[in-house]
Amino acid sequence: MDLRQYVRDIPDFPKPGILFRDITPLLRDPAGWHEVIQRLVAVCDRWQPDLIVGIESRGFIVGTALATQLGKGFVPVRKPGKLPGEVIGIDYTLEYGSDRLEIHADALSDHPKVLLVDDLLATGGTASASAELVTKAGGELVGCGFVIELADLAGRAKLPEGVPVESLIIYG
């Protein structure tokens, strides 16, 4: 199944010059969404994660569906101030500024094997920071999975060396 048929291109969103790859038609289509999750399940069969970690916010959609299908737990990586209780955080730089991501301090304290997921790998800044946060929190990063990768933006190069990456749809 060609998953690209379910991705809508939105020019000039969120600002002029940007071509946004919208996965909401994919989420709406039961057959397309099922195919996404089954392909990611196959990835997990190779990498054998104990937990799925998803990056805010569309990584929650991908990650919870995958975790449910696998019978695994799910852990969210969130923007600052969104998680109650004790957190571990990481600050990272963006093209035009900086940001912070957080995870519960005890979420990975038992050193599980983790698959990090999100809907999109673009420049790699958020994914790279999330990967570092997984390690900082005690997890062993066994792989990264994305629905879409914008290869022209070279985000894959920012991810930890030696960690396998699987993207279901690659543009550029």
UniProtKB/Swiss-Prot annotation:
Chief place where the protein resides: cytoplasm
Gene3D superfamilies, per the entry: 3.40.50.2020
Cellular component aspect of the GO annotation: cytoplasm
Alphabetized SUPFAM superfamilies for the sequence: PRTase-like
GO biological process: adenine salvage; AMP salvage; purine ribonucleoside salvage
Keywords tagged on the record: Cytoplasm, Glycosyltransferase, Purine salvage, Transferase
Catalytic activity: AMP + diphosphate = 5-phospho-alpha-D-ribose 1-diphosphate + adenine
Pathway stated in the Swiss-Prot or TrEMBL entry: Purine metabolism; AMP biosynthesis via salvage pathway; AMP from adenine: step 1/1
Broadest EC class assigned to this enzyme: transferase
GO MF assignments: adenine binding; adenine phosphoribosyltransferase activity; AMP binding
Compartment(s): Cytoplasm
Domain of life, per lineage: Bacteria
Record-listed E.C. numbers: 2.4.2.7
Entries under HAMAP family matching the protein: Aden_phosphoribosyltr
Function: Catalyzes a salvage reaction resulting in the formation of AMP, that is energically less costly than de novo synthesis.
UniProt record similarity statement: Belongs to the purine/pyrimidine phosphoribosyltransferase family.
Quaternary context: Homodimer.
Protein name from the UniProt record: Adenine phosphoribosyltransferase
Species per Swiss-Prot/TrEMBL record: Synechococcus sp. (strain WH7803)
Gene this chain is encoded by: apt
